[in-house]
């Protein structure tokens, strides 16, 4: 095989490899994004909690159980003004509210 033929073969091989790499690039990006989104879900929503909210200002409560995303349970209150805040699960007042809610 002549050097010119070898050069054309090498160039064709490089072009094919580049074409394959360009085809695979979106797949790699999609996998990277999916992993980043999954990692983003694995965290506690409640970084800071409060025990200074009066029950009459609360319109709804959401309890998120502890799991792989967060080692502690989380209590999220929606207030009448639409704001969401995290309540301290150890506060006696909120323990009482949860108990009453579960009994009803």
Swiss-Prot record:
Single GO cellular component term: extracellular space
Top-level lineage group: Eukaryota
Residues that, per the record, bind heparin: 95-101
Coiled coil, from the record: none
InterPro entries in the cross-refs: Chemokine_b/g/d, Chemokine_CXC, Chemokine_CXC_CS, Chemokine_IL8-like_dom, CXC_Chemokine_domain, Interleukin_8-like_sf
Signal peptide from the UniProt entry: 1-30
Disulfide bonds: 44-70, 46-86
Annotated localization: Secreted
PTM info: The N-terminal processed forms of platelet factor 4 variant seems to be produced by proteolytic cleavage. The most abundant form is Platelet factor 4 variant(5-74).
Entry-linked SUPFAM superfamilies: Interleukin 8-like chemokines
Gene3D superfamilies assigned: 2.40.50.40
Pfam families recorded: IL8 (PF00048)
Biological process (GO), any one: cellular response to lipopolysaccharide
tRNA processing found in the keyword field: no
Subunit composition and interactions: Homotetramer.
Note: Binding to heparin is much weaker than in the close homolog PF4/CXCL4.
Function: Inhibitor of angiogenesis. Inhibitor of endothelial cell chemotaxis (in vitro).
Protein family: Belongs to the intercrine alpha (chemokine CxC) family.
Protein name per its UniProtKB record: Platelet factor 4 variant
């Amino acid at each position: 095989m002549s050097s010119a033929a070898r050069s054309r073969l090498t160039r064709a091989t490089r072009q094919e490899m580049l074409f394959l790499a360009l085809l695979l690039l979106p797949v790699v990006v999609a996998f990277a994004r999916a992993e980043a989104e999954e990692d983003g879900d694995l965290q506690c929503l409640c970084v800071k909690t409060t025990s200074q909210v009066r029950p009459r200002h609360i319109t709804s409560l959401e309890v998120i159980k502890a799991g792989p995303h967060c080692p502690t349970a989380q209590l999220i209150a929606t207030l009448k003004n639409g704001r969401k805040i995290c309540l301290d699960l150890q506060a006696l007042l909120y323990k009482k509210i949860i108990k009453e809610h579960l009994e009803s």
